[in-house]
């Protein structure tokens, strides 16, 4: 959406339908965002480096610069509707908040309270990461199609075995404070323009939050968990080998 030609085409189509274009966005405090981003790319079998190696290459990702959204909304003549993506919103439901933002009553829709994309936990991240490392070490690469198939295999398998977990954290307090410091100025520019408040006031429960990393690369699990992890990696890898045996789209 940040590519102007795509944004123009999208919002022009909205106007052709005689609808008023609104740009609903969910800015999030960057440390929590980068933590979530890491989980998604690892769980999707697209990355396998340690969290601390992932952060430097992603910390200045364009999607983290929320002030650009103001210019984007003005450029396509759309109303910007910013909804702070906080821990409270996660609990209360993002879908319900979105429906309210576009003027709809969430009670008219079923299942708005269900969380459909919960952040995976350290066990899930570790298994997916180890499988990706095994693939990379063998000199092979997954195609986009194969990676999606692997992801679809992983979650049901862990759920069936009772091993699915949530709540991964790769952040340390020092790393989180550094990320917040790097984005403080841009965040305040955005927050003052759209909410007339400083960023830390809008995200009071998120800015300065304490973190304890539970990544298995950092906090080694107990022997029983390690045994389960090694067995799970072995079994998932067998499924991945079957997936890779079939030709698919170009590699990632």
Predicted ranges, named:
Residues 1-252:
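Anion-recognition interface
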